[in-house]
């Protein structure tokens, strides 16, 4: 036991020699001499009184045979910690990670977000940060991208890409291209479903991932990859699909599980670095293809007005490296996340046929025929579609929580928490709580409709909405809100509308433990959806 304690103390105190999350401390706009002496601060309890998990006990429960937390999924472990310590707990740092305060109190979420500063620090993505700031600094120096960067470098990059990615008019350019992708998705479903049962294979998640990568590539690379067609199965695109799958799989292991990669280069770290190199290599090839295409068009006298230029074209006008890194970030962050969200929506609609029927009524007005094209005007009139997407994100949230580094001293759950502390916000219990969402176990898109006419008199929508907006933030909040929000919303809206217009969707299997916790919540069951053709 003594040897174990000594080893644990060494592991806790030794500075990582490969990489540490604290090697790149966030820059803040906090006055260094700020001292709070207001009544709220003075009346709050000291930081030291926050319930604290003992590191030795935590290690034993998590890693040793018979430990209470051993083999638990992330959400199960968080629930167990909540039962043991309450709604706020301090978790000590370990194996190169910083300690953090974890809170389940939605009132704290607002405090944290209101005090995140102009350059919010979001912990995580350490492996990607290591790849870009250390291992491949020669390429990424000065342009680290949206996902791993912090401080001023993040702010500078975000200020470049925000006007391009967050403008609704720029997203609308992709209606026709997305429509083509979705038509191919529909045809592929018809090909792979069983002729007698109309069910797709249990590995349907791979098909969904192909659809999401195809969709995001239309924006990120200004190109359809052909992943939904027979001709695209042995292409460069297939390699990219494989590399991104490996990236997400290994990220979960290196970021979430106890690992020594921060102390020495483990075999998994080396494999991950090769994977990220491969993603970079393939992305560069596609960006170079786009540059050649644009140069050829310029020689031929093709000139597009500003409002018709693609996202990639606009970013290339700024800087090739900026365009390449942003494309990589969109690919790395835009596949599994959208796939999980889309899966959750399909499960909710399949298990609630009356909601699906109402959604189809709305979609039929937008798409009178199965092959009708989407228009900007028609897609403004789909409130129930947007409500279904939003409610599915509440029922099956994509992430367990969010985290920020405090930029000023703050009172969290009645305790004085100093600036520089990482606070992890866990809303998932509140999403299922009657206190915040009446009838929380029911899938009720009506709760998100803005007025009584939208809810068709079937449900007092205002009575079902949460009174605390910080409980439910599927795309984050503030300056660090998801930069791809509008793109993801477009993918989900167009893809869902096309499927519901073509198919009645059923899921005649259990949805128990439908998702498992990794970096995000991932589908955990065979997705044997039944797709029955809708009559014309």
From Swiss-Prot:
Its main location: mitochondrion. Its cofactor is heme. It is found in: Mitochondrion membrane. Keywords: Heme, Iron, Membrane, Metal-binding, Mitochondrion, Monooxygenase, Oxidoreductase, Transit peptide. GO terms for cellular component: mitochondrial membrane. InterPro entries: CYP11_CYP27_families, Cyt_P450, Cyt_P450_CS, Cyt_P450_E_grp-I, Cyt_P450_sf. The lineage of its organism: Eukaryota, Metazoa, Ecdysozoa, Arthropoda, Hexapoda. GO terms for molecular function: heme binding; iron ion binding; monooxygenase activity; oxidoreductase activity, acting on paired donors, with incorporation or reduction of molecular oxygen. CDD domains: CYP24A1-like. Its EC number is 1.14.-.-. Heme binds at residue 482. This is Probable cytochrome P450 12a5, mitochondrial. It comes from Drosophila melanogaster (Fruit fly). It comes from the Eukaryota. It is an enzyme of class 1 (oxidoreductase). PROSITE patterns: CYTOCHROME_P450 (PS00086). Gene3D superfamilies: Cytochrome P450 (1.10.630.10). Belongs to the cytochrome P450 family. It holds the Pfam family p450. The keyword Endoplasmic reticulum does not apply.
């Amino acid at each position: 036991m003594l040897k174990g304690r000594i080893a644990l103390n060494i592991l806790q105190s030794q500075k990582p020699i490969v990489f540490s999350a604290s090697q790149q401390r966030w820059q803040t706009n906090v006055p260094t001499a700020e001292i709070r002496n207001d009544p709220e601060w003075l009346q709050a309890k000291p930081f030291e009184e926050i319930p604290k998990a003992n590191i030795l006990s935590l290690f034993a429960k998590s890693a040793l045979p018979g430990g209470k937390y051993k083999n638990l999924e992330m959400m199960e472990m968080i629930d167990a910690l909540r039962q043991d310590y309450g709604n706020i707990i301090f978790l000590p740092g370990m194996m190169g990670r910083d300690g953090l305060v974890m809170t389940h109190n939605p009132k704290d979420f607002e405090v944290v977000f209101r005090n995140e500063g102009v350059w919010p620090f979001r912990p995580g993505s350490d492996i990607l940060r290591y790849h870009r700031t250390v291992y491949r600094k020669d390429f990424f120096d000065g342009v680290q991208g949206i996902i791993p960067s912090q401080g001023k470098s993040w702010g500078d990059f975000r200020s470049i890409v925000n006007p391009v990615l967050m403008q609704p008019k720029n997203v609308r350019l992709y209606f026709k291209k997305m429509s083509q992708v979705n038509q191919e998705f529909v045809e592929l479903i018809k090909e792979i479903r069983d002729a007698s049962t109309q069910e797709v294979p249990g590995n349907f998640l791979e098909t969904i991932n192909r659809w999401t990568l195809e969709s995001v590539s239309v924006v990120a690379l200004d190109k359809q990859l052909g992943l939904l067609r027979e001709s695209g199965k042995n292409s460069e695109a297939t390699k990219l699909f494989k590399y991104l799958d490996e990236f997400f799989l290994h990220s979960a292991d290196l970021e979430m599980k106890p690992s020594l990669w921060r102390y020495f280069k483990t075999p998994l770290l080396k494999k991950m670095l090769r994977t990220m190199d491969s993603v970079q290599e393939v992305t560069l090839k596609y960006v170079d293809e786009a540059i050649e295409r644009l140069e050829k068009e310029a020689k031929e006298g093709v000139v597009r007005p500003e409002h018709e230029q693609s996202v990639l074209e606009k970013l290339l006008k700024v800087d090739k490296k900026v365009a390449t890194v942003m494309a990589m970030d969109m690919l790395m962050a835009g596949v599994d996340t959208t796939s999980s969200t889309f899966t959750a929506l399909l499960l909710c609609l399949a298990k609630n046929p009356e909601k699906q029927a109402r959604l189809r009524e709305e979609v039929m007005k937008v798409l009178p025929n199965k092959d009708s094209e989407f228009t900007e005007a028609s897609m403004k009139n789909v409130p129930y579609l947007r409500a279904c997407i939003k409610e599915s994100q509440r029922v099956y949230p994509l992430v367990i929580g969010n985290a920020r580094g405090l930029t000023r001293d703050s009172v969290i759950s009645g305790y004085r928490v100093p600036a520089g502390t990482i606070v992890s916000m866990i809303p998932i219990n509140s999403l299922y709580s009657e206190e915040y969402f009446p009838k929380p176990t029911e899938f009720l898109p009506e709760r998100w409709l803005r007025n009584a006419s939208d809810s068709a008199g079937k449900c007092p929508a205002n009575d079902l909405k949460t009174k605390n907006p910080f409980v439910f933030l599927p795309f984050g909040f503030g300056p660090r809100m998801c930069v791809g929000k509008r793109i993801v919303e477009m993918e989900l809206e167009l893809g869902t509308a096309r499927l519901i217009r073509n198919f009645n969707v059923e899921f005649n299997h259990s949805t128990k433990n439908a998702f498992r916790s990794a970096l995000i919540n991932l589908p955990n069951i065979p997705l044997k959806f039944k797709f029955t053709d809708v009559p014309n």
